[in-house]
């Protein structure tokens, strides 16, 4: 029986992964969540894992009451996540937490020799060089869970000996595609959370609205597939049917298509290389009638431009724009800044951060901390 652990089990990706695990007889050995004690406790009672972690330490006593008498070990904070990442007898760890908190547990699991199903973008955005190097040294496989990176990964299967020319990274365009900055001045949180195609958590939905999500995926793709910035083309594809494509040396393009449902990439990552029945709607191209492809608007969406600039410069810049974005999005969701301020803050931090080499995880964390401090100054200004 295959075994797994899940960081972020109460979120959108985590809950769908548990459905996949239940259907395909995968043993779940540990669960972790940020703050949703009741949902985590319900999952734990159903699955009886060896260990659970609630990241918020102030929630521990409530979780202990809910799991009293079960014998399940309970931990908190970063140490709790690392304990799960170090567990013996685990085939794969799904990292679907949100934010920079995902980096250290990923590196810990790699050091243990555990394969990773990666849905936490920040792991590769901020610490890509460290993560890819560590995985190569330990012989650890990283299976992408993002639909776009999963699509690219799938298109590469069986073509390992052929030269990759580049990739086409598709984007839905979010809820504000076709709008200009003058149109977006009064955007509300509710409007930004209304994604046309995907059901996701709040932070990633805002990132999709600002196109920051696509910028983060651009950076991820560079590390996952060993690409240069000029080898990646972003294309807005409103229907979210073509999840991404790869282009080979002979100019042939191979794409992966499917209905917009995260269960497919989750299942592919967890069961690779097997393809088995999946509880998703069958794709009917005739139901769509036509598929459209357009260029993104780099002038309106500052976050996308900031990400590409950051990764082109390299070093600590990707970690900086990521940290600034996390602070800006949190401020927007709390009503402290306007929608357009997110892009302004991210670009300002990108422009004002001097480049430094990343040599260890402490360098990544320092870049993140300094960027957050600067972002908070801009938020409070």
PLM region spans:
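Catalytic, metal-anchored helix/loop core of enzyme active sites in primary metabolism
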Residues: 1-381
